[in-house]
């Protein structure tokens, strides 16, 4: 017996009953999240009298666009529209809390124009999704916190000027998170401070350092590591001007700020500050845009400026603030292709008697390219991708289609001897461990990043940006295959 399928009827949507229109400023100009790229202009809607008090600039509303309902943000209220006879009414104000200020709405328009995108593509990165339970919470009052510890640093007086637009070159061999935290504490006395960090690990370290100066109530985080509820709650605090210090990742660069606030961008050349989704804005460039168009101070922080920042320094648009320091640097070149030059062994052994030694290597993995040991031809897969080896006992496999090659033989000379080029951190660990036996080895790269290292002598091997924190400092830092740090691979080989 065939079981009959349940009857499904088409939904019938009737025209909603029109409500009386507001007498004062009856038209609202709204950005609508249409999802259509070329429909990026504001649209006019009637404001019902019952929603007139809630329909203000920056309010989140629901409107009918075409035959479906869409979210929108109110830009302004006006008394007329070119299409007065064909306007639809706003359906509802979805949140009693404002999600944008006139300043941020202007910023959304500037960014959309500069990067040739839709304003709502920018808004998706700037404004978190609504949480109804948070909207019902009462606003909490937070007083301005005072510095708990006196500042122990003496930076350039330029850094504490009321008006500033500069690049601060950090001194080497100094914890950057500590320096940035001290800078935040110094600027905190002059007004609101927004810190943009390249990644969550950096953000956590700055928050930890700031805890020595300020109470946690003064610090608000805006990043994807928070829960959906906490992020929306913190965002509303920022919109209400209840946050004195804001910490966030690239999306926080759109946070509403008070007049005269300071934006601090860490690692301004980092790829993490680029938004991968359309329209592809960059947090550093958005901060530069805010500084040029609005009353906002800007400090870019890093060890050396990027080409873009260097150009602004050359044109004197940015002030370059240098840091005087002296670091003992020794450059040594291998003579026979060895990993560590023989002349460096004595320096490293001497440093291991004092504390941990850090080896910075350019790549993760084991052998990132397989070559024939006899003819030195590159081993390729049938799909055209190069072969890699992920361990000493593993067979080569393709980096693109993951096809394994057990019993690999060179297609040119039929030799089965493998030469591993482009050594990764795992291969470095093997060779360094043999060179300096009886010392513990700590690897830090990729998904396995060590937060800190012990104070005892040990070998720490890390890729750039993954180096663990040493509370006593590293006795020596060795950059292996230094030229590789400046090479960017743009192709499959």
What are these regions (language model features)?
Residues 236-257, 445, 452-469:
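Conserved two-lobed SF2 helicase motor
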Residues 200-203, 211, 419-452, 463-464, ...:
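P-loop/Walker A nucleotide phosphate-binding surfaces of NTP-dependent enzymes
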Residues 1-335, 350-353, 358, 476-480, ...:
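Accessory, non-ATPase domains that flank or precede helicase/AAA+ motor cores in DNA-metabolism machines
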